[in-house]
Amino acid sequence: MKVAVLGAAGGIGQALSLLLKTQLPAGSELSLYDVAPVVPGVAVDLSHIPTDVKVTGFGKDDLASALVGSDIVLIPAGVPRKPGMDRSDLFNMNAGIVKNLVQGVADNCPNACVGIITNPVNTTVPIAAEVLKKAGCYDKRKLFGVTTLDVIRSEAFVGELRGLNPENVNVPVIGGHSGTTILPLLSQVEGVEFTEQEIKDLTHRIQNAGTEVVEAKAGGGSATLSMGQAAARFALSLLKGLQGQDTIECTYVEGPGDNAKFFAQPVRLGKNGAEEILSYGKLSAFEQKCMDEMLDGLKGDIQTGIDFAS
């Protein structure tokens, strides 16, 4: 299997690449691309880690070489959040980056599964879909918005609150990947009861966790390490699926459109990518209210992406 990371020299890209170098199955190839001149050095640095994963770095003129033969393409490229910015402020800078990189995917590895990490994911995934449609190679089973960070944060925060091992906590997170569009289904956490206030506080913390990190880093970065871990978890689950070992992850995909054209919910990953979009079950009254209040915003984010790509 060949995995390409586009934007591999950034904070997320380096963390993700390190995790993939240490966790991809033996015999895998890891292809690192970035416009930053440091990327060949990142590849050399990682090549000194003794795992049977071949790492190659590609500079800004070598996108085609980086992509050819890729099974999975992960795109964390773009400008990170700074204090005072929200994910939508990133749109003007990052939309064009995603559009160009996905065009590269269409030209060089049109059958690859693509995981979009670049924010705002609510909008960049629809942009990617439109680019792939125009190129005649769009398969909705193979395009994903990586929302796993919301899931791992939910698991960590629930574990912290209840003194549980977070590795044993499972929290489905549905909707989108910014602000109130992030909807953790805390009513579905097995074996744990929350008060109404705890649910409100936890939901708010999960929705604003990115800001918590940006402010804590005081201008020195955004959530790069946790996002790297989240992206690696998603990529490794997807890889297992492609190899015939079905896995389930929450991810932002084009679905039946019951709520919005693109929507994050549990998905069964298999040999063709998104094999089946699973039901997220019954919502509590609080969750349903949150859903009703956020859908218009999510639909607006999606339309912004479609309009940009057109």
UniProtKB/Swiss-Prot annotation:
Keywords for this protein: NAD, Oxidoreductase, Tricarboxylic acid cycle
Look up the coiled coil feature and give its residue ranges: none
Query: Which sites bind NAD(+)?
Result: 7-13, 34, 94, 117-119, 227
Catalytic activity line of the entry: (S)-malate + NAD(+) = oxaloacetate + NADH + H(+)
Q: Which GO terms describe its cellular component?
A: cytoplasm
Q: Name one GO molecular function term.
A: L-malate dehydrogenase (NAD+) activity
Could you say which residues bind substrate here? 81, 87, 119, 153
InterPro entries associated with the record: L-lactate/malate_DH, Lactate/malate_DH_C, Lactate/malate_DH_N, Lactate_DH/Glyco_Ohase_4_C, Malate_DH_AS, Malate_DH_type1, Malate_DH_type1_bac, NAD(P)-bd_dom_sf
An example Gene Ontology biological process: malate metabolic process
Q: Which domain of life is it from?
A: Bacteria
First-tier enzyme category under EC? oxidoreductase
Q: What is its EC number?
A: 1.1.1.37
Write out the catalytic residues in the record. 177
Function recorded in the entry:
Catalyzes the reversible oxidation of malate to oxaloacetate.
Q: Which family does it belong to?
A: Belongs to the LDH/MDH superfamily. MDH type 1 family.
Instruction: Please name the NCBIfam families in this protein's record.
Output: MDH_euk_gproteo
Assembly with partners or alone:
Homodimer.
Specify the protein name: Malate dehydrogenase
Q: What does UniProt list as this organism's lineage?
A: Bacteria, Pseudomonadati, Pseudomonadota, Gammaproteobacteria, Alteromonadales
The coding gene here is: mdh
